[in-house]
């Protein structure tokens, strides 16, 4: 199978991002920059999880557009298609098949206890989809199909990864060792970029207040305006403290964008107030995203290249996923078709 370069001595990593909206600097600083650092050390599978995106209604043409945009952002961020398996989730049917199988080894009570489901279903009433309830099982399938050793996750996904571990252990105990039980990988920096207006919440593209997030593709003037409006406090002191969540968040952003540690940032802005600090945070973000934006636009203009990447990625992913799926079916007791 040409192009499948799974090095046995390397551990495997799986992660993905939903194409359910434009990506934020939270995605970039919190996930993508860390992923790039991992690509030489691990066998990496990075997915665009479009099956997860449809747990809430999507406009079809927008979903198609954003799926390619996420792929372009992956590559523009520095994820090399030669070093990583970059693919679209729906192009590998093993994900949905494995999700059904794992559903049969997951308890309803476990899914009802998922905090994210409870939060999202509160306002949805009867319109909540079964897909949203089963979302963590599909996530388990995503991870277990590739025998991932490590999964880069934010705090909001830790509970889902715990469920993945429980499902894998349950299946292994019921039959025989089949899956690796994955561990979380949490990056040392940028693991959690918060909302600019509600700094106790994670930055999210689904936030109601557009001033709460900065998109990777936002122009410089918008970035400057959003940082200027970012919530701080009346202290006027640049200090890394849980009692100043807005300032702490801006310091995290500046630290991740520039590589400076928070101690040196505190010293640099001692006695200067927030005006210069905010200006420099905005400039640091712009310096990071402007070259990225040019690369994203360049890749989006070359649809044939993106098609080549996602087709080769799906082929490589399918090769690995189908082997795991066949093993699952055999252990469960299905008659295999080949």
From Swiss-Prot:
UniProt short sequence motif 'KMSKS' region, positions renumbered to this chain: 202-206
Gene Ontology terms: biological process: tryptophanyl-tRNA aminoacylation
Keyword Cytoplasm: yes
Keyword annotations: Aminoacyl-tRNA synthetase, ATP-binding, Cytoplasm, Ligase, Nucleotide-binding, Protein biosynthesis
Localization per record: Cytoplasm
Pfam family, any one: tRNA-synt_1b
GO MF annotations, alphabetized: ATP binding; tryptophan-tRNA ligase activity
Enzyme class: ligase
Motif ('HIGH' region): 19-27
InterPro entries for this protein: aa-tRNA-synth_I_CS (IPR001412), aa-tRNA-synth_Ic (IPR002305), Rossmann-like_a/b/a_fold (IPR014729), Trp-tRNA-ligase (IPR002306), Trp-tRNA-ligase_bac-type (IPR024109), Trp-tRNA_synthetase (IPR050203)
Chief location: cytoplasm
EC numbers for this chain: 6.1.1.2
Chain sites annotated for binding L-tryptophan: 142
Signal sequence bounds: none
Domain of life from the UniProt record: Bacteria
One cellular component (GO) term of this entry: cytosol
CDD domains linked to this entry: TrpRS_core
Entry binding sites for ATP: 18-20, 26-27, 154-156, 193, 202-206
Catalytically driven reaction(s): tRNA(Trp) + L-tryptophan + ATP = L-tryptophyl-tRNA(Trp) + AMP + diphosphate + H(+)
The family this protein is said to belong to: Belongs to the class-I aminoacyl-tRNA synthetase family.
NCBIfam families: trpS (TIGR00233)
Subunit text: Homodimer.
Main function: Catalyzes the attachment of tryptophan to tRNA(Trp).
Name this polypeptide is given: Tryptophan--tRNA ligase
């Amino acid at each position: 199978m040409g192009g499948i370069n799974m090095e046995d001595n390397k551990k495997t990593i799986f992660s993905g991002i939903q194409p359910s909206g434009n990506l934020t600097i939270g995605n970039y600083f919190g996930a993508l920059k860390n992923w790039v650092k991992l690509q030489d050390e691990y066998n990496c599978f990075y997915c665009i999880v479009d099956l997860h995106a449809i747990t809430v209604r999507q406009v079809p043409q927008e979903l198609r557009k954003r799926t390619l945009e996420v792929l372009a952002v992956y590559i523009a961020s520095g994820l090399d298609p030669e070093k990583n398996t970059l693919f679209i989730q729906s192009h590998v049917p093993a994900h949905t098949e494995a999700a059904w199988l794992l559903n049969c080894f997951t308890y309803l009570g476990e899914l009802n206890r998922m905090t994210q489901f409870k939060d999202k279903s509160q306002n949805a009433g009867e319109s909540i989809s079964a897909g949203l309830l089963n979302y963590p099982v599909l996530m388990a399938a995503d991870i277990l199909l590739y025998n991932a050793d490590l999964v880069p996750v934010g705090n909001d996904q830790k509970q889902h990864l715990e469920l993945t571990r429980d499902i894998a252990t349950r299946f292994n105990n019921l039959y025989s060792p089949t899956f690796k039980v994955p561990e979380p990988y949490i990056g040392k920096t940028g693991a959690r970029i918060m909302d600019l207006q509600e700094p106790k919440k994670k930055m999210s593209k689904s936030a109601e207040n557009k001033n709460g997030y900065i998109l990777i593709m936002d122009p410089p003037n918008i970035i400057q305006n959003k940082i200027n409006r970012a919530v701080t406090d009346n202290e006027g002191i640049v200090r890394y403290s849980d009692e100043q969540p807005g300032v702490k968040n801006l310091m995290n952003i500046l630290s991740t964008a520039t590589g400076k540690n928070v101690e040196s940032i505190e010293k640099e802005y001692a006695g200067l107030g927030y005006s210069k600090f905010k200006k420099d945070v905005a400039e640091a973000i712009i310096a990071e995203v402007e070259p990225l934006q040019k690369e994203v636009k360049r890749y989006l203009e070359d649809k044939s290249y993106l098609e080549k990447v996602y087709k080769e990625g799906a082929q490589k992913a399918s090769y690995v996923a189908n082997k795991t799926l066949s093993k699952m079916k055999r252990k469960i007791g299905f008659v295999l078709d080949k």
